[in-house]
Amino acid sequence: MRGPGAVQIGPACGARSVSPWETAAVTEGSGRKWLTVRGALRVPEITVYFWVIKALSTAMGESTSDYLVHAIDPVIAVALGFAGVCGALALQFAMRRYVAWTYWLAVAGVGVFGTMAADVLHVRFGVAYAASTVLYAVVLIAVFVTWARTEGTLSIHTVDTPRREAFYWAVVVATFAMGTALGDLAATTFHLGYFGSGVLFAGVIAIPAFGYWRLHWNAIFSFWFAYVATRPLGASFADWMGKSRTVGGLGWGDGRVALALALAIFCLVAFLALTRRDLQQPDRSPRLP
């Protein structure tokens, strides 16, 4: 019997159901079947480059947001952040397939605005970090559930249509907002400080890595677990580097940290755009019956 979020793989005779948390590939001998369309995927291959740039982008988003809201009028800063993320996402959705520059520009835009969205609730409306963390967690779960029920899988290897990409980016926005609130919760409410909070989330992100490689955890669950954890990890270390010594930082300045991180991201994305090492491999294209 198929569950509410299951998808059928294989011919009708002898077909089996796959839950949204199950990998979208099934092994048959030495080959694999992937529920994707050749060349149409809109997300990169998950490699070490992906995780490095993702961590840098979360840190850059935190530093850039904090710098802008203090350097110019906060209302103008938020408006610029919103316009920036809308423009970046519009450009990303206009692409017919994955392009490194547009994808990571969208991630950077979400990183900046996601930080602002989380900070606005606390600074402007006085919502406690614990409450905002729970709120964004509920939003994230709701997006996951809707995505799973609509598409039958949460695998990023099936992000090959505008609707699936919309779900993907909705999750990304929610993870950035929730991760920002969670990082601030650990650093301030739990009094761990920026560096202590960063160490904590470094340990947290090691959990899905160990679970996947050593305990054979589900690939999709492990990916999204790690993806969520990268946000508070990067944000905590960005605050540690950028904030003044009086609040537990190194005092390098948010602007300088943001600029250095943006330069590092630019160099890595340029490398990927030239080498194309982050493209989905051809053998992950479908060989469906």
Question: Can you name each region flagged by the protein language model?
Answer:
Residues 21-289:
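Polytopic alpha-helical membrane proteins, predominantly small-molecule transporters/carriers
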